[in-house]
């Protein structure tokens, strides 16, 4: 019912979600879990910068209702410009009060005439959010909050000290690769590349083997670079077009294919990451792709971030 992160059948997804929550409740000794938190992501998710400006004529308090209005305006701006997308989340980036920039939201005692609010907007196809909602309608569960994946990973992985000093998260997913850089209360940089581990497997498939075998070879024997191959083993893989035929795949050939796609995906992200190296103290690598043999070493060779 879910294929590479895409919901194909909402009714089946609803049943599976309900069953997973039942098993989880049993595991943690709860009678029932009534609330759920979900993360949203995928190839359709994009990042956009948006801002709103207000002239209060004279210096006076920047009240919360004004900030709420500015946030709502930013959301409307994006959805008016791109009717096919929905704003999945709107995260404050920074504020400008009378020409002075600050990371934190204005405090009750701050006064300003000219107020700017800058946001990072996570947007995706409208059906992305709707399919999640439809799936949960078929379960007696309530979605308490939907997080975009970069924000959820930030809360899950980074400590308060990391947030204060600055941190980066590289999420190596199946269909997308996302780099997020965060410091204080501000996203310094966020970019989603619509390629991931699935694209690596499709490249390996071009050797004349099936996609499931390509995925298995990548996960069990693949390396992030040819230099990391210690023994150039050869793997006999069944050929889909011949009942008794097989394809011989060398470990170095496998690594070369993987490395080529990784370079295409990661080179621009690593270049951008290095521009922020002096502003962050730690880089987290997560997602299924992070488990590829030699991935940590591969990343370390391309960046000066710890």
Go through the PLM ranges and name each one.
Residues 1-36, 40-167, 188, 210, ...:
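Nucleotide/phosphate-binding catalytic cleft detector across ATP-hydrolyzing
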Residues 9-20, 128, 196, 200, ...:
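Helical mechanochemical/support elements of P-loop NTPase systems and associated helical scaffolds
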Residues 38, 136, 171, 204, ...:
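Residue-level signature of catalytic and energy-coupling elements of molecular machines
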Residues 39, 149, 172, 182, ...:
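Generic beta-strand/beta-sheet core signal
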Residues 47-50, 179, 295-296:
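Short glycine-/acidic-enriched loop or helix-start segments at secondary-structure transitions
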Residues 73, 131-135, 156, 203, ...:
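Alpha-helical scaffold segments in soluble metabolic enzymes
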Residues 160-226:
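Acidic, glycine-rich loop-and-beta core segments that form the ion-binding/anion-interacting portion
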Residues 243-306:
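C-terminal structural cap/anchor segments
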